[in-house]
Amino acid sequence: MIRYFLLVAIIIFLTFIFPIEGIPAVEKTSDSNSVSGEILCLPNTANFSTHDCANLGPSAYISRMSDLGISFPFRVENGTQPDQSLTYVDFRYGEVTRENAKVYASLEDAIKNGEVVRRVDSPYSFISYYDEAVVDGKRYYMVDYGGWMTANDISRIGTPSLFQGRAFTHTPEHSFGWIAFPTETKRSPGFGIDDYTGRELYHYQEVQIYSTTEVDGIEWYMIGPDEWIPEKKEWQRIIGRVIPSKTPPEGVDNGRWIEVNLKDQTIAVYDQGQLVFATLIASGIEPFWTRPGLFQIYQKLDSTPMRGAFEADRSDAYYLEDVPWTMYYDKARALHGAYWHNGFGVPRSHGCVNMSVGDARWLYDWAGEGDWVYVWDPSGETPTDPEVYGDGGA
């Protein structure tokens, strides 16, 4: 059996070296897109001379995919996932579920409904707790290094989002991104043809982008061989895209900058012109946009409380304890971890740039005070008039 396969291999090899007499080579016609003849190039021979065969069929398809950067078997290789230990945070968190919730002076006061030292009065409030106790079947949480709250007023938060972006040792050749809203891929761009593949892309799945085209005003991304997704469906953005660029924004003088892309809801981090990290974010939602411009980090805090209100009746007031890995760069606007939601890739903040805890920790460890933050919106939809912006918030 081995001799048989060896013989076949030798015959195929000799066929390419010495074309069989009687079978003519392909003759090109005046039309460069058409040929006459009987021999097609075999797949994976596109890198060799094709003067004796027609680069059509499977060979042409593989050549076209190769030009886009797609090889067979198809592989996705793009950076590395940062250390998962970065997702760990020292605090345990809870959402305050009762209006004007009481904070008691001691555990005994909480048990007996005794002395109240303050109330949590913001409609949207999250606390961090350091200890807990169960007395007579009822649970209590220690907050503020001594104050206590009852479990009736708090809904504990489990593990914050474990989503992490990608770290790089060199700048990728292609753009890439993460799925912000689950979607099914199509065999061709555009909604006019019902050619869905049946393959669902899940939330936060990473994809490569090999080609783009616009159909009916919507940009479509080729993420694999004959596999396309739209940038958005109606108002819902499908993917957060990163387009690597080695050129620093005007004004960056130290080769280090953090690019915040408001259209795609992504961050790209550059060191000496090389992409070193990228991930999804959640920036400010209308009318609390994250302000475009070039800024510098002016303060770093391992954790800090944040509070604010923009409506006169304080109906939108928020209170957030121990916001991790915070870096202020534009008044009250900061880059920081967000433990209270898992909605990265979609605007939802009061102006700050929200990241997962793990991504915020990576960026916090990399960046220093004075490093540049470049915020921009390629779509031009975010206002640039300074009069539109206040101090911002979480």
Which residues does each PLM region occupy?
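Cell wall/extracellular polymer interaction/catalysis modules
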Residues: 197-200, 211-292
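Boundary regions of SH3-family modules and the immediately adjacent low-complexity/disordered segments
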Residues: 26-93, 142-178, 222-254
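Conserved beta-strand/loop element in small beta-rich adapter and peptidoglycan-binding domains
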Residues: 41-51, 109-134, 193-215
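Exported/periplasmic cell-wall-interacting domains
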Residues: 25, 251-253, 277-280, 285, ...
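Positively charged n-region of N-terminal signal peptides that target proteins for export
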Residues: 1-4
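Boundary at the C-terminal end of the N-terminal hydrophobic targeting segment
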Residues: 19-27
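Bacterial N-terminal signal peptides
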Residues: 7-17
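Short, solvent-exposed interaction modules
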Residues: 98-107, 118-119, 166-210
